[in-house]
C-alpha cells in the first residue's frame, strides 16, 4: 500500500532485468528525494525531448545508459526546456556521446535545413508528454484521488504509483494489485476489511484511504490508496546504516508495538499477517515509524488461501496452518526486532522457503538470534518468536516491558505486598532521575501514599502531590503516568491471580515476616539483576528499584549468593521477587546454609521463623515452602518484607554467623547457597522474580513470566541417610506439588515424565524442569557432602552434646528420623496419588506456605528432624564448637530452619539462603554480643534459650538456656520468641528435632559447662544484642527478633519441640529423648495413645504439610498460622520475655518455660510483656513490623509498620487469615490419612490463624487499629495500624522510618533511613539492661510463668467464664507461689509468664487454631495483663516496667507509656481479639469455622487433639523434669489446684480454645461475637496452650515421678474420657461464673501475677487445653462448652477458655461481663472492665469446674 518510492516493494524489484523502462528506473533512483524534487525530476525525466531521446536511443540499440549519461541527458533536457530553439545539431553531439555513432551526427548535420521543423515537432512531443505526465492517468470512482503515471515501486503482486488527494492536496500512494481472481466471498471480505481499515487513524499506522476494483489493460485489479511514506522503509534504513543504535531500536520498536496494539485492540482485532521491515515505513522529518501494507496480506491470502503468500522468514509456524491469531504479529515483530538488532535478514542462512519452514515449524531460531548482544533485547526477541503461540508475549506485555517503557524518571512501587483483595494499595513513589523532572526533588526521598483502586485516579493523586509541594505542576502528568502504570500492572496481576491472590497474600505476609530476616542480606542480593522478566513483571521497575535500594541500604544482610538463588529458582524466581525472600534469602542462604549445616537445628529454626511469617502452621516445612510462596506471592510483600527485614535480619544473621564458626558457616552457606542459587536461579533468574521487589531488571518487570511457568523450590534435603530431597513445584495452573525423591535413586527424567503425565509440568517445560531438577540434585549432593563432612568434624562435639542432653541427642536423631519418617509418612499422606516421589498437591498453589510444611519437613533444615543436616546438626551443633552451638543457641530456631530450609529453600526459594544469611549474620552478631552479653547474663541467656530448646533435659535446658539466654536476653526475646514460636507452631512437630537438637546440644553444653556455654551464649547474645541493639532498641522487633521471630513462627515448633515440645507434644515424635525415661515412656504412650502415628505427629510439620497440601484450604490456613506464629514470636521476642526465662537461674525451669514460652512465646511473651511491660505492647507491634518487613525493627520503615501490624496482626491474620487458616487446617482434618496429619493441620491452623491473623491483622482497618495501639504502646517501633488501610500502613511505615515525615496523605521517607536504625539502637541500648534485669526475674518469671501457666491452663477452659477465672487465679497463685519462692515475683512473673505463654503457644501450635488464637490473645492480652499487672501490683508493675524498659529500650515508649500501653493494649488486644475471632470464623483452621468444627469433632481429630495435649503434657513433663524446685513447687501448687479443680482444669486443658486467647483480645476490643472473637480465640488458644504446657512442665518439675505417673494416668484417663465422650459445653454464664470463682480464689494469691497471668492466661489456657487434650482448640462456635465442675486439674486447661476462644464469635455473649478490652484477656472473660484489670485479672473470674480433660472433645480443637 504505502510504498517507499525509492525502494522496491519486494526482492523481485531488484531482480528485474536492465530492460526495465527508464521511467521506472529513474523514478526509483530518485526515491530518496522529496516529493517536490521527485516531481521535478519526473518532469525532466519524462520531458518530450527526453522521451525522444530515449526512443531514439532504444531504436538505435544504443548501449545502455550509464548513470552519468542519464544525468547528462537530464541536464541537456533542462537546457532544451530553457531554450526552446535549440538546434538539432546540439542534440546530435549528445546522441553521439550517448551512442558513439558518428553516422547519426552526420545525418543530423545534413538535415540542418529541416532543423526548424524537427525542433517544433520535438517541442510539441515534449510538451505533450509533459502534459500527459501532469495529467492524471486515472481517477478514483469517487473522483477524490488521482493517479499519476509515476511508478514509485513494484512488488510481486503490486505496483505503486504516485497519487494525489484532491481534497487535501496531499500526495498519496496508489497501489494496484494484480487480479487475484477473488471469489465473491473473498471480494466481500476484502470490502469489509477495507471499510474497516478506512476508519483506522493512528500515528503508527499508515493511513488507508480507499480501495476499489478496477480494470487495467483489460484485466481486473484492486486499487488501494494509502498514505505516502517519503523516507523509505525500515529495510532501506537498515541497508543504509547497517547498525541501529539501541536508543533508536527502542524508540522504533515501541512505535511498532503501539501500532500493533492499536490494531489488535480493535473490534474485531485486526491482524496484519505480513509484518516485516519492508512494510514498516519511516517518515524522515519526524522519525516516526508506521506500519503499512495493511490489507495486502488479506488480499494475498484470500486468493492464495492454500498457498502461503507472505514472507516465510517472518511467518509464525501456525501461519502455515491457517489457524492463527494476533500472536502471529508478535512473532513477526520479534523477527523484525531481530533484523533491526542484527541488520541481518532472519534465516538468511536458509536457501529456500522450505528450509525456513522446516526450521520455523521445528522451533529452531534464526542463526542471527545468537548474534544479538543485548541480553534484554535477546530476551524480548526470544519471548516473541517462541514456537508455541500461547507462550509468546503479548503486545501489552511487550509495551509494559521495562525495555520499552518510556522513562519518566519516576518509579512507583508497592510499599507493601498486595493481598489481591484490598482495594486500597500502599504505594511508594521514587524519583529516580530528578533531571527528567522540571521541578526540584530530592532523589533520596520516597513518597508513600495510599491509592484506592476504586475511588482514586492517578491524576487526582498526582494533583494532590503537586498541591502538597512534592512535584512541580509540569511533572504531574509524568507522576500520574507512573502511578497509572503501576496500578494497571497491579490490576493485571490481580486479574491473573484471582484464586492464588489470597494465598499469595498470605504468603506475602509470611514472606514478609520471613523476609524481614533475609532482607538485610537481600539488600545485597536484590541488587543483583535477574533474568526473570516474567517474575519481574509483577513488580515494576520502581518496586524492584526500591527494594534493591532498600536492601542495599542494609548491606549487613548482604547475601552474595542471593541473586544466584533467585535466578536459579523458577518458582522462587518470582520470589526474589519471587525470591524477595528468595533472592535476599539466597544471600541468606549462603550464611544460613552454613549455619544450618553446622547447626542444622538452630539454623533451621531461624529459617523457619522467617518462613513462619508465611505460614506458622508449617513452621519448618512451611518456612521452606512458605518462602517460595512468599517470594512468589508478592513482589510487594517481598519488597516490604525486605525493607523491614533488613534491619532485623542483619542482626539475626550476623549473630548466627558469629555463633557458628563464621568461616565455616560461610563456607557451608556458600555451598548451600550455590546449590540453592542454581536451583533457584531458574525460578528467580531476574533476581527480581515476580516478587522480588528489587528492581533487578526494569525491562522484565512489567512483563509476565516468559520463561518457565512452573516454579521449583527445594524444601528440604534429608541428611538422615536416605538422601531424600523434598521439592515443591508451583505448577503452571497454580497448584503446589510437593514431592520427594532420592538424590541417587530417582532420575530427574522419570520425575519429569510423571509430572508431565499428571499435568503438573507442561510438555514444553519438561526440559527446563529436568534441568532444574538436575541442578537441585547437584546442590543436594553438595549439601549432603558438606553435611557429612560437617557431621564428621562435629561428630565429637555432637556426641558430647547429645550425651549431655539425651533429649538433645535423641531429639536430633529423632528429628532426623522424623525427617525421614515425615518424608515417608507425611509424604505418603501428602503424596496423594503421585507415586514414588510422594507428590503433595496443593490446589491453592499460591499459598506456598501450605505446601511449605510438607516440603520443609523433608528438608530437615526446616524441621530439626527433617533438616538436611539434622543429625549432622546434632553432631554439628556439638562438634561445630560452642561457637556453632552458640549460634544455634542464639538462633536455635533460626539456624535450624536455615540449615535445612536453606538447603532446600535456598535452592527453592532463595529465601532460605536469605534466612541462612541472616542466621549467619545473627551468629556473628551473637558472637560479638556474646562477649558483652556474657558479662551481662551469660548463663541466663543461655538458660533462656536452652530451656526453650531443650527443656526436657534439665542440664541441657540449663545449658541451652544459658547459651540461649545469652543469645536471647539481648536477642533473647527474639530468640526465645523464635523458639517459642517454633514450639507453639508445632508442639510435637519436628521443631524440637532441628532447633531442639542444636539448642539441646547447646543446652547440654551450657548445663555441663554453664560458664563456657554462658560465655558463649552471652557472646552470641551480646553480639546479637549488639547488632540487635544497633538495629533497634526494640531488638525484639529488630533484626534479631525479626530474624528469630520472623523465622520462629514457622520454626517455632522446631525450636521448642526439641526438648520440651518434643516431649510434651505427643503429636510429633519427640525427636529428642526425654530427660527421664518415665517421661519418655509417657511420651511414647501419649504418642501411641493420642497419635498412633506419633512419629508422624512429631513430623507434624510435614504431616501438616501433607495434610495441608492435600487440603488446599488448610494449606492456606497453615500459611496463615505460620504468619500468625511469626508475629507472635516476634512480639514475644520483642517483649524479651524469653530473655527473662533465659536469664532465670533455674535453667531447667527456664528451659521448660522457655520451651513453653517458645511454644507460647509469641502470644505469651507478648502477653507477658504487655502485662509486665508496655514493651509487650510494643512487642506485638514490633512483631508486626518484623513480619511486615525489616522496618519492623525500624519504626520509620513503612514496611515495618505492616510487620508490626502483622505481629499484632497475628490476630489480624487470624481475622483475615481465618479463611486461610481454615484452609490450612482443613487439609489435615480433611485428610483422613492420619491423625497426626490432622494434628499437623491443627497446628497449621494455629499457625495459619496466627499468620492469617497477622495477615488479616494487616487488613487495613484492623491492622491500623492494632498498629495504632501498638504504636501508642511501643511508640515508634510499633506501627500498629494495618487497619487504617494501606494509607495508614504506608504512613506508619514511613513514620517508622527515620527521616520520614508526612504531608497530607503522603509519607515522605528518606531512603537511607529505611533501615530500622532506631530499633537497632533501641534494642541494643535497652536489651542488655533488660537481659540483666530479667536474668533474675527471668527464673522467677519462668517458674512463675509455668506455675501460672499451669493454673492458667486449668483456668483457661473456664476462661470464657470459669476457665478464664480459674486460669487467672491459678496463674496468680502460681505467680505468688513463684514470687514467694523466687522473691522477685514481678520480673520472675514476667519471665515465667512469657515462658508459660511460650509453652502454651507450643501446645497451641499443636492446635493450630488454638495456637493462633492464643498467640494473638497473648499478644494483645499480654499487654493488658502487663498493664493490669502493673496497675494491680505496684511492686510487680515496677518490675514489669523495669522489665519492659530493660527489655526493650525500643519498647521504651511502651514501658514509659504504660497507661498508654494499657489503652492501646486494650485496643490492640481488642483488635487482635476481633481479628482472631474473625480468623477463627473464616479460616478453615479457625476454631469457629464450621468446617473445622466438623473435622475437629471427628474421632481422628479428637485423638489427634488428645495426642497434641499429651504431647504437650510430655513436653511439660520433660521441661518440668529439668526445671528446678520452683517449677516443682509450682507444679505441686498446680497439682493441688488440679486436685481441687481437677475436672474443671482438665476440661479447660482439653479445649484451651483459641477463643480464649481471643477472649483476651476480646477484652481489649470488647467485641462480643464478632470476628474479633475469632481473633481472640486464636490468641486465647495460644495462651491456653502455653498455660497447659507450663502446667504440665511445672508438675513434673515439682514431682518428677509423680508428675510422670500423673501424666501417664492423666493421659490414660484423658484419652479414655476424651475419646469416650465430649462433655457438654457449659453455658457462657456457667463458664464465666466458674472462671470468676476460680479467679476470685486465685486472685488474692496471685494478684501481682494476675497481670502477667492474665497476659498468659489465654496462651496458657490454650496450651493446657491442648494438653488436657480432648477439646480442640477451635471448637465449633455453636459447640457448647462443657460445664466444668470441681477444681481445675493441674493439666486441666480451662476448657471454657478454649471453647470460649473458639466460641467467642460463636457466642453472642462471648465474654460475659467483659468489655472490649476485658474480653481480650482470655483469663478475664468475665471481666467487663479494662483490658486486664489487676483486680479483675484471673481471680475475678471463677475457674470453671473442669469435668475432665477428656470430657472436652478434641475435635473442636
Curated annotation (Swiss-Prot):
Residues binding ATP, per UniProt: 226-229, 276
Reactions it catalyzes: L-seryl-[protein] + ATP = O-phospho-L-seryl-[protein] + ADP + H(+); L-threonyl-[protein] + ATP = O-phospho-L-threonyl-[protein] + ADP + H(+)
GO aspect biological process, one term: positive regulation of peptidyl-threonine phosphorylation
GO molecular function: ATP binding; molecular condensate scaffold activity; protein kinase activity; protein serine kinase activity; protein serine/threonine kinase activity; transmembrane transporter binding; transporter activator activity
Regulation affecting activity: Activated in response to hyperosmotic stress: cell shrinkage promotes formation of a membraneless compartment that concentrates WNK3 with its substrates, OXSR1/OSR1 and STK39/SPAK. Activation requires autophosphorylation of Ser-307 and, to a lower extent, Ser-303. Autophosphorylation and subsequent activation is inhibited by increases in intracellular ionic strength: Cl(-) potently inhibits WNK3 kinase activity via direct binding. Also inhibited by K(+) ions. Kinase activity is inhibited by WNK4.
Protein modification: Autophosphorylated at Ser-303 and Ser-307, promoting its activity. Phosphorylation at Thr-540 prevents interaction with KLHL3 and subsequent ubiquitination and degradation by the BCR(KLHL3) complex.
SUPFAM superfamilies recorded: Protein kinase-like (PK-like)
Region annotation Interaction with KLHL3: where it falls in the sequence: 536-546
Obligatory cofactor(s): Mg(2+)
Location of the region described as Disordered in the Swiss-Prot/TrEMBL record: 1-25, 66-85, 551-604, 674-705, 1404-1440, 1479-1498, 1536-1574, 1621-1650, 1734-1757
Ranges in a coiled coil: none
Compartmental location: Cytoplasm
Residue(s) carrying Phosphothreonine: 540
UniProt enzyme class: transferase
Signal sequence coordinates: none
Sequence ranges of Low complexity compositional bias: 1479-1491, 1624-1637
Expression sites by tissue: Expressed in pancreatic duct.
Summary of the function given for this chain in its UniProt record: Serine/threonine-protein kinase component of the WNK3-SPAK/OSR1 kinase cascade, which plays an important role in the regulation of electrolyte homeostasis and regulatory volume increase in response to hyperosmotic stress. WNK3 mediates regulatory volume increase in response to hyperosmotic stress by acting as a molecular crowding sensor, which senses cell shrinkage and mediates formation of a membraneless compartment by undergoing liquid-liquid phase separation.
Domain statement: Disordered regions undergo liquid-liquid phase separation (LLPS) for the formation of a cytoplasmic membraneless compartment that concentrates WNK1 with its substrates, OXSR1/OSR1 and STK39/SPAK.
Subunit annotation: Interacts with WNK1 and WNK4.
Protein's UniProt name: Serine/threonine-protein kinase WNK3
Organism, scientific name: Mus musculus
Organism lineage: Eukaryota, Metazoa, Chordata, Craniata, Vertebrata
Amino acid at each position: 500500500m504505502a510504498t517507499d518510492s525509492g525502494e522496491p516493494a519486494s526482492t523481485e524489484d531488484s531482480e528485474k532485468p536492465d530492460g526495465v523502462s527508464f521511467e521506472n528506473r529513474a523514478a526509483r533512483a530518485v526515491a530518496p528525494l522529496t516529493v517536490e524534487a521527485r516531481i521535478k525530476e519526473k518532469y525532466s525525466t519524462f520531458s518530450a525531448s527526453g522521451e525522444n531521446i530515449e526512443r531514439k536511443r532504444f531504436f538505435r540499440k544504443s548501449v545502455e545508459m550509464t548513470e552519468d549519461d542519464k544525468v547528462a541527458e537530464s541536464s541537456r533536457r533542462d537546457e532544451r526546456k530553457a531554450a526552446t530553439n535549440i538546434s538539432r545539431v546540439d542534440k546530435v553531439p549528445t546522441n553521439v556521446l550517448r551512442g558513439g555513432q558518428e553516422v547519426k551526427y552526420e545525418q543530423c548535420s545534413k538535415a540542418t535545413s529541416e532543423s526548424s521543423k524537427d525542433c517544433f515537432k520535438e517541442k510539441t512531443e515534449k510538451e505533450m508528454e509533459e502534459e500527459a505526465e501532469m495529467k492524471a492517468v486515472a481517477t478514483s470512482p469517487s473522483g477524490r484521488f488521482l493517479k499519476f503515471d509515476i511508478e514509485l515501486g513494484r512488488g510481486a503482486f503490486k505496483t505503486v504509483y504516485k497519487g494525489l488527494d484532491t481534497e487535501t492536496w496531499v500526495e498519496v500512494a496508489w497501489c494496484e494489485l494484480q487480479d487475484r481472481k477473488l471469489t465473491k466471498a473473498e471480494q466481500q471480505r476484502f470490502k469489509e476489511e477495507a471499510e474497516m481499515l478506512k476508519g483506522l487513524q493512528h500515528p503508527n499506522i499508515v493511513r488507508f484511504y480507499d480501495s476499489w476494483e478496477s480494470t487495467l489493460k483489460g484485466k481486473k485489479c484492486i486499487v488501494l490508496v494509502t498514505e505516502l511514506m517519503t523516507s523509505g522503509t525500515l529495510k532501506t534504513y537498515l541497508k543504509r546504516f547497517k547498525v541501529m543504535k539501541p536508543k533508536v531500536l527502542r524508540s522504533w520498536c515501541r512505535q511498532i508495538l503501539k501500532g500493533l496494539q492499536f490494531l489488535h485492540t480493535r473490534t474485531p482485532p485486526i491482524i496484519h499477517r505480513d509484518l516485516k521491515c519492508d512494510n514498516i515505513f519511516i517518515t524522515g522529518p519526524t522519525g516516526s515509524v508506521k506500519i503499512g501494507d495493511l490489507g495486502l496480506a488479506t488480499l494475498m491470502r484470500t486468493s492464495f488461501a492454500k498457498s502461503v503468500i507472505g514472507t516465510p522468514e517472518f511467518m509464525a509456524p501456525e501461519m502455515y496452518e491457517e489457524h492463527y491469531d494476533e500472536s502471529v504479529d508478535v512473532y513477526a515483530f520479534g523477527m523484525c526486532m531481530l533484523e533491526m538488532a542484527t541488520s541481518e535478514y532472519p534465516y538468511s542462512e536458509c536457501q529456500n522457503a522450505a528450509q525456513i519452514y522446516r526450521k520455523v515449524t521445528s522451533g529452531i531460531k534464526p542463526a542471527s538470534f545468537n548474534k544479538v548482544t543485548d541480553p534484554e533485547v535477546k530476551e524480548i526477541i526470544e519471548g516473541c518468536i517462541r514456537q508455541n503461540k500461547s507462550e509468546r508475549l503479548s503486545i501489552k506485555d511487550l509495551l509494559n516491558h521495562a525495555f520499552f517503557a518510556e522513562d519518566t524518571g519516576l518509579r512507583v512501587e508497592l510499599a507493601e505486598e498486595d493481598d489481591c483483595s484490598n482495594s486500597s494499595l500502599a504505594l511508594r513513589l521514587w524519583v529516580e532521575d530528578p533531571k527528567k523532572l522540571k521541578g526540584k526533588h530530592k532523589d533520596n526521598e520516597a513518597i508513600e501514599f495510599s491509592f484506592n483502586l476504586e475511588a482514586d485516579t492517578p491524576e487526582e493523586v498526582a494533583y494532590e502531590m503537586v498541591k502538597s509541594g512534592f512535584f512541580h505542576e509540569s511533572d504531574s502528568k509524568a507522576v500520574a503516568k507512573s502511578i497509572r502504570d503501576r496500578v494497571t500492572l497491579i490490576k493485571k496481576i490481580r486479574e491473573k491471580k484471582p484464586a492464588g491472590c489470597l494465598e499469595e497474600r498470605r504468603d506475602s505476609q509470611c514472606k514478609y515476616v520471613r523476609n524481614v530476616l533475609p532482607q538485610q542480606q537481600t539488600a545485597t542480593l536484590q541488587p543483583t539483576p535477574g533474568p526473570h522478566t516474567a517474575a519481574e513483571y509483577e513488580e515494576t521497575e520502581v518496586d524492584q528499584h526500591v527494594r534493591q535500594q532498600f536492601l542495599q541500604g542494609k548491606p549487613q544482610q548482604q547475601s552474595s549468593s542471593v541473586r544466584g538463588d533467585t535466578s536459579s529458582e523458577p518458582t522462587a524466581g518470582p520470589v526474589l521477587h519471587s525470591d524477595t525472600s528468595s533472592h535476599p534469602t539466597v544471600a541468606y542462604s549462603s550464611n544460613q546454609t552454613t549455619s544450618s549445616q553446622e547447626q542444622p537445628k538452630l539454623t533451621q529454626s531461624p529459617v523457619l521463623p522467617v518462613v513462619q511469617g508465611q505460614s506458622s502452621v508449617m513452621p519448618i516445612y512451611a518456612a521452606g515452602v512458605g518462602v517460595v510462596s512468599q517470594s512468589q506471592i508478592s513482589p510487594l510483600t517481598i519488597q516490604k518484607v525486605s525493607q523491614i527485614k533488613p534491619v532485623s535480619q542483619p542482626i539475626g544473621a550476623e549473630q548466627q554467623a558469629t555463633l557458628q564458626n563464621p568461616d565455616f558457616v560461610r563456607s557451608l552457606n556458600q555451598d548451600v547457597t550455590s546449590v540453592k542459587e542454581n536451583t533457584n536461579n531458574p525460578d528467580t533468574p531476574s533476581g527480581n522474580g515476580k516478587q522480588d521487589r528489587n528492581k533487578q531488571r526494569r525491562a522484565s518487570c512489567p512483563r509476565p513470566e516468559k520463561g518457565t511457568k512452573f516454579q521449583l523450590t527445594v524444601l528440604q534435603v534429608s541428611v538422615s541417610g536416605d538422601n531424600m530431597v523434598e521439592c515443591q513445584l508451583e505448577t503452571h495452573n497454580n497448584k503446589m506439588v510437593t514431592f520427594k525423591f532420592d538424590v541417587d535413586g530417582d532420575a530427574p527424567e522419570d520425575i519429569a515424565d510423571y509430572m508431565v503425565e499428571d499435568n503438573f509440568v507442561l510438555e514444553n517445560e519438561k526440559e527446563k524442569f529436568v534441568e532444574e531438577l538436575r541442578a537441585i540434585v547437584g546442590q543436594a549432593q553438595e549439601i549432603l557432602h558438606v553435611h557429612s563432612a560437617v557431621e564428621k568434624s562435629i561428630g565429637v562435639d555432637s556426641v558430647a552434646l547429645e550425651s549431655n542432653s539425651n533429649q538433645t541427642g535423641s531429639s536430633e536423631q529423632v528429628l532426623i528420623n522424623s525427617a525421614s519418617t515425615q518424608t515417608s509418612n507425611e509424604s505418603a499422606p501428602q503424596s496423594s496419588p503421585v507415586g514414588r516421589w510422594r507428590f503433595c498437591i496443593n490446589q491453592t498453589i499460591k499459598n506456598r506456605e501450605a505446601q511449605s510444611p510438607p516440603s520443609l519437613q523433608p528438608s530437615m533444615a526446616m524441621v530439626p528432624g527433617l533438616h538436611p543436616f539434622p543429625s549432622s546438626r546434632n553432631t554439628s551443633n556439638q562438634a561445630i564448637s560452642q561457637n556453632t552451638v552458640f549460634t544455634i543457641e542464639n538462633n536455635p530456631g533460626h539456624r535450624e530452619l536455615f540449615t535445612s530450609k536453606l538447603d532446600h529453600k535456598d535452592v527453592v526459594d532463595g529465601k532460605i539462603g536469605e534466612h541462612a544469611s541472616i542466621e549467619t549474620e545473627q551468629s556473628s552478631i551473637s558472637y560479638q554480643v556474646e562477649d558483652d552479653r556474657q558479662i551481662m547474663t551469660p548463663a541466663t541467656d543461655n538458660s533462656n534459650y536452652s530451656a526453650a530448646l531443650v527443656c526436657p533435659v534439665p542440664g541441657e535446658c540449663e545449658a541451652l538456656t544459658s547459651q540461649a539466654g545469652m543469645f536471647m536476653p539481648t536477642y533473647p526475646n527474639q530468640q526465645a520468641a523464635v523458639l517459642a514460636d517454633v514450639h507453639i507452631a508445632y508442639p510435637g512437630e519436628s521443631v524440637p528435632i532441628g532447633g531442639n537438637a542444636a539448642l539441646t546440644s547447646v543446652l547440654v553444653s551450657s548445663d555441663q559447662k554453664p560458664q563456657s556455654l554462658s560465655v558463649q551464649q552471652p557472646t552470641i547474645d551480646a553480639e546479637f544484642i549488639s547488632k540487635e541493639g544497633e538495629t533497634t532498641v526494640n531488638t525484639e522487633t529488630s533484626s534479631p527478633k525479626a530474624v528469630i521471630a520472623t523465622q520462629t513462627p514457622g520454626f517455632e515448633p522446631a525450636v521448642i519441640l526439641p526438648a520440651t515440645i518434643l516431649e510434651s507434644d505427643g503429636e510429633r515424635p519427640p525427636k529428642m529423648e526425654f530427660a527421664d525415661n518415665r517421661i519418655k515412656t509417657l511420651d511414647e504412650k501419649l504418642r501411641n495413645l493420642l497419635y498412633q502415628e506419633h512419629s508422624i505427629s512429631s513430623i507434624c510439620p510435614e504431616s501438616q504439610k501433607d495434610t495441608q497440601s492435600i487440603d488446599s484450604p488448610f494449606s492456606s490456613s497453615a500459611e496463615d498460622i505460620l504468619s500468625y506464629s511469626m508475629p507472635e514470636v516476634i512480639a514475644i521476642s520483642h517483649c524479651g520475655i524469653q530473655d527473662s526465662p533465659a536469664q532465670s537461674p533455674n535453667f531447667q525451669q527456664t528451659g521448660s518455660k522457655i520451651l513453653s514460652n517458645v511454644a507460647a512465646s509469641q502470644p505469651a511473651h507478648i502477653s507477658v510483656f504487655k502485662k509486665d511491660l508496655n514493651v509487650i505492647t510494643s512487642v506485638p507491634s514490633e512483631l508486626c513490623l518484623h513480619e511486615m518487613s525489616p522496618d519492623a525493627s525500624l519504626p520509620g520503615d513503612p514496611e515495618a509498620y505492616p510487620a508490626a501490624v502483622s505481629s499484632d496482626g497475628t490476630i489480624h491474620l487470624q481475622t483475615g487469615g481465618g479463611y486461610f487458616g481454615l484452609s490450612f487446617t482443613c487439609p489435615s482434618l480433611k485428610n483422613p490419612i492420619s491423625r497426626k496429619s490432622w494434628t499437623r493441620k491443627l497446628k497449621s491452623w494455629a499457625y495459619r490463624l496466627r499468620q492469617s491473623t497477622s495477615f488479616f491483622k494487616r487488613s487495613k482497618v484492623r491492622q491500623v487499629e492494632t498498629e495504632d495501639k501498638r504504636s501508642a504502646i511501643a511508640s515508634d517501633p510499633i506501627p500498629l495500624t494495618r487497619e487504617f488501610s494501606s494509607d495508614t500502613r504506608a504512613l506508619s511505615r514511613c513514620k517508622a522510618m527515620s527521616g520520614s515525615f508526612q504531608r497530607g496523605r503522603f509519607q515522605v521517607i528518606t531512603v537511607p533511613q529505611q533501615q530500622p536504625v532506631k530499633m537497632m539502637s533501641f534494642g541494643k541500648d535497652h536489651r542488655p539492661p533488660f537481659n540483666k534485669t530479667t536474668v533474675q526475674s527471668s527464673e522467677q518469671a519462668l517458674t512463675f510463668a509455668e506455675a501460672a501457666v499451669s493454673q492458667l491452663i486449668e483456668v483457661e477452659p473456664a476462661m470464657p467464664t470459669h476457665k478464664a477465672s480459674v486460669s487467672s487465679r491459678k496463674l496468680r497463685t502460681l505467680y505468688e507461689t513463684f514470687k514467694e519462692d523466687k522473691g522477685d515475683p514481678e520480673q520472675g512473673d514476667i519471665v515465667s509468664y512469657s515462658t508459660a505463654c511460650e509453652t502454651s503457644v507450643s501446645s497451641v501450635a499443636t492446635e493450630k487454631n488454638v495456637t493462633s488464637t492464643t498467640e494473638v490473645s497473648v499478644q494483645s492480652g499480654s499487654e493488658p495483663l502487663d498493664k493490669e499487672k502493673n496497675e494491680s501490683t505496684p511492686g510487680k508493675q515496677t518490675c514489669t516496667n523495669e522489665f519492659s524498659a530493660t527489655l526493650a529500650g525500643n519498647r521504651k515508649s511502651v514501658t514509659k507509656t504504660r497507661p498508654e500501653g494499657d489503652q492501646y493494649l486494650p485496643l490492640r488486644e481488642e483488635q487482635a481479639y476481633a481479628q482472631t475471632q474473625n480468623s477463627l470464623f473464616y479460616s478453615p483452621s479457625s476454631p469457629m469455622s464450621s468446617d473445622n468444627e466438623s473435622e475437629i469433632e471427628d474421632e481422628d481429630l479428637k485423638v489427634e487433639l488428645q495426642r497434641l495435649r499429651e504431647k504437650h503434657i510430655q513436653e511439660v513433663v520433660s521441661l518440668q523434669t529439668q526445671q528446678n524446685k520452683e517449677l516443682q513447687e509450682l507444679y505441686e501448687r498446680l497439682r493441688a489446684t488440679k486436685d481441687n479443680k481437677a475436672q474443671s482444669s482438665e476440661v479447660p486443658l482439653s479445649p484451651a480454645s483459641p477463643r480464649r486467647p481471643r477472649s483476651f483480645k476480646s477484652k481489649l476490643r470488647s467485641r462480643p461475637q464478632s470476628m474479633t472473637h475469632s481473633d481472640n480465640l486464636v490468641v486465647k488458644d495460644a495462651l491456653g496452650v502455653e498455660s497447659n504446657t507450663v502446667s504440665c512442665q511445672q508438675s513434673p518439675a515439682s514431682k518428677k515421678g509423680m508428675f510422670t505417673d500423673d501424666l501417664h494416668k492423666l493421659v490414660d484417663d484423658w484419652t479414655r474420657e476424651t475419646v469416650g465422650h465430649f462433655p457438654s459445653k457449659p453455658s457462657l454464664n456457667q463458664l464465666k461464673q466458674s472462671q470468676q470463682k476460680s479467679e476470685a480464689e486465685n486472685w488474692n494469691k496471685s494478684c501481682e501475677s494476675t497481670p502477667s497471668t492474665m497476659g498468659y492466661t489465654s496462651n496458657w489456657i490454650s496450651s493446657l487445653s491442648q494438653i488436657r487434650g480432648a477439646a480442640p482448640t477451635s471448637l465449633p462456635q455453636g459447640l457448647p462448652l462443657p460445664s466444668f465442675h470441681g477444681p481445675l486439674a493441674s493439666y486441666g486447661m480451662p476448657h471454657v477458655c478454649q471453647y470460649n476462644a473458639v466460641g467467642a464469635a460463636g457466642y453472642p455473649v462471648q465474654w460475659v461481663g467483659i468489655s472490649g478490652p476485658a474480653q481480650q484477656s482470655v483469663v478475664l472473660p468475665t471481666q467487663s472492665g479494662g483490658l486486664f484489670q489487676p483486680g479483675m485479672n484471673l481471680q475475678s473470674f471463677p475457674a470453671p469446674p473442669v469435668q475432665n480433660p477428656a470430657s472436652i472433645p478434641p475435635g473442636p480443637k
